[in-house]
């Protein structure tokens, strides 16, 4: 039970004696251990001195034992403290050992993880090399497409210049018609002397001319509206081009192709409108040669022609502005042509490295916005159709030529 039996023995050794009897016992024990035999010799004269000396020796022995006992206690406490410190150090070393074991296990797991990451990186490097080869092939095909698009762009510019020349010729004819209107003013006095039937006929023909003017105005307004829609579609195309220039080179080329096709269609529509205006100008010329008009009506007609000429000059300015925008777009396209290859390749590489790959951007939004602009242009609110109605019998004619024939027959 007791871990230190020697400690109990020491405590028994340091118990103080109770009295002279005990001293005598101790003296007997000391004599048995080898003390001189003269202490036990009975002597009446030497007994008090001997007893006093024994007591002093006993006291000295007690002091020595007490000091020895105190030293032993201090030594025992030091040993206990040392044992406690050794136990704490052992626990600390065990804790450090457990931490070191956990650290070794964690480092082993990290080593396995790094090894798997290294293998994954090698696989990705192989994929990147394959992608680089594919990008080189795509670069050659894109260069060929850009060359073909530049040729188409030059062809469309030549067509635009031809349309501008035709428009200038048409304006010259309009000025000639205005000169004829001034000549008709001098004939106004003679025309006022004619028969009342001729006056009615002139009024009917005047109404037909006004209807033709309304048609021409509507055609001009339609042309302005189409030009505004074309300009809006052009701005929309430019925005789509600017937003998708970094995502896909093929989409840019497709947008430019659609834009060139739209410009060609617009030029064809302009050419048809110019031909129609030429025919109407010829009809007006015939009408002005055969049917005189009142001065007020001639002034109105002249003012309308001047307004139309002013409007056409504005249209010319707008077309020149669009031509400048087209040239600026071509210059920007040439500047961005080289940078787009690198940006597209970097973007594709970045998309392949993300954890959740995003679907590639398709050129559908640009085409959709372009076709939406065209559909909005085609589905614009319809204008009010011209009223080809006979003022005498209220006959509703389908077109201006039919109305003129009917009016002549109705008057006769």
Curated annotation (Swiss-Prot):
What is the protein name for this chain? NF-kappa-B essential modulator
- Region Self-association, as annotated, extends over 246-358
Span list, region Required for interaction with TNFAIP3: 249-412
- Using the record for this protein, list the coiled-coil segments as residue ranges, or answer none: 49-345
Residues covered by region (Linear polyubiquitin-binding, does not bind to 'Lys-63'-linked polyubiquitin) = 250-339
- Domain comment, in the record's words? The leucine-zipper domain and the CCHC NOA-type zinc-fingers constitute the UBAN region and are essential for polyubiquitin binding and for the activation of IRF3.
Residue numbers bearing the Phosphoserine modification? 31, 43, 68, 85, 369, 380
Q: What species is this protein from?
A: Mus musculus (Mouse)
Spell out the subunit comment: Homodimer; disulfide-linked. Component of the I-kappa-B-kinase (IKK) core complex consisting of CHUK, IKBKB and IKBKG; probably four alpha/CHUK-beta/IKBKB dimers are associated with four gamma/IKBKG subunits. The IKK core complex seems to associate with regulatory or adapter proteins to form a IKK-signalosome holo-complex. The IKK complex associates with TERF2IP/RAP1, leading to promote IKK-mediated phosphorylation of RELA/p65. Part of a complex composed of NCOA2, NCOA3, CHUK/IKKA, IKBKB, IKBKG and CREBBP. Interacts with COPS3, CYLD, NALP2, TRPC4AP and PIDD1.
Q: Where is this cross-link: Glycyl lysine isopeptide (Lys-Gly) (interchain with G-Cter in SUMO)?
A: 270, 302
Q: Which GO terms describe its molecular function?
A: identical protein binding; K63-linked polyubiquitin modification-dependent protein binding; linear polyubiquitin binding; protein domain specific binding; protein heterodimerization activity; protein homodimerization activity; signaling adaptor activity; transferrin receptor binding
Modified how: Phosphorylation at Ser-68 attenuates aminoterminal homodimerization. Polyubiquitinated on Lys-278 via 'Lys-63'-linked ubiquitin; the ubiquitination is mediated downstream of NOD2 and RIPK2 and probably plays a role in signaling by facilitating interactions with ubiquitin domain-containing proteins and activates the NF-kappa-B pathway. Polyubiquitinated on Lys-278 and Lys-302 through 'Lys-63'-linked ubiquitin; the ubiquitination is mediated by BCL10, MALT1 and TRAF6 and probably plays a role in signaling by facilitating interactions with ubiquitin domain-containing proteins and activates the NF-kappa-B pathway.
- Residues covered by region (Required for interaction with and ubiquitination by MARCHF2): 1-197
- Write out the entry's keywords from A to Z: Coiled coil, Cytoplasm, Disulfide bond, DNA damage, Isopeptide bond, Metal-binding, Nucleus, Phosphoprotein, Transcription, Transcription regulation, Ubl conjugation, Zinc, Zinc-finger
* Chain positions recorded as Zn(2+) binding sites: 390, 393, 406, 410
The UniProt record lists the Glycyl lysine isopeptide (Lys-Gly) (interchain with G-Cter in ubiquitin) crosslink at 111, 139, 143, 226, 246, 270, 276, 278, 285, 295, 302, 314, 318-319, 392
Q: Name one GO biological process term.
A: negative regulation of endoplasmic reticulum stress-induced intrinsic apoptotic signaling pathway
